[in-house]
Amino acid sequence: SRGLGDVYKRQAIAYAISSKNKHTPIRPVQTYQPASNFDSEENVERKVKAVDEMFNKEEFLSWTRSLFVKLQEAWTARDWSTIRVFETNELFEQHQKQLQGYIDRKQINVMERICVLSVKLADFKQTGNKDVLTVVLKSRMNDYIIDETTGKIVKGDKTTDRYSTYKLDFIRTTGEKTKPGSIEINTTNCPNCGAPTQITSSGKCEYCGSVITTGEHSWALSNLEKIG
């Protein structure tokens, strides 16, 4: 089945305008990036700490694990608004559109038994006014599609585990530093006005109207690509 990981990366996703079904997606071409193309985790950590001495590798990778699981759960729940704060505008809109395709077809892509097997730093660079931190994550999960009305499986099965490797790119504004408590999986306060807020699909604080994404203040997911 076409799990969440198979629809990541803007450059790798396309839609076929079919005469039979205008929502028919083309399975993206997987781009396999050899491990040799990545930097060593020690070098990556050193590069990040050179510009952000408070960066904590263990905390960041733990947050990445939690976020990855949260992504899969939100995909199954078909409620991408809970992810708004953690993604860039472009990536959020891409994923929201893809998820809407399942909703329109009255299908649910179920992701179950999600297990993050490993996660490590793979690259760090500064481009333009952005810091870009790359992570490689390996996972195991069950992935199948059901009809929302009947509950009948239309693709995949409940017993087969899928092993996959992903490349996650996180960005933030260059010059931002790690602050205690700045990386949280449950963001409930607007970083601009401090008010407790619900994250809407537009990503705006309901009190001050500011667009809320973690990329302005901390790391935000800009790309997640299946590489193996």
Language-model features: where?
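Short, small-residue-biased leader/transition segments that mark boundaries at the very start
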Residues: 2-8
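Transmembrane-cytosolic junction motif
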Residues: 13-33
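Core segments of small alpha/beta cavity-forming domains
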Residues: 32-113, 192, 206-207, 211, ...
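Surface-exposed, charged secondary-structure patches
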Residues: 106-149
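Short flexible coil/turn linkers enriched for glycine and charged/polar residues
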Residues: 126-131, 162, 184, 199
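Extended alpha-helical interaction scaffolds used for oligomerization/partner binding
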Residues: 140, 152, 161-167
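Mixed-charge, low-complexity intrinsically disordered segments
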Residues: 147-159
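Cys/His-clustered metal-coordination modules, chiefly Zn-binding fingers
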Residues: 168-228
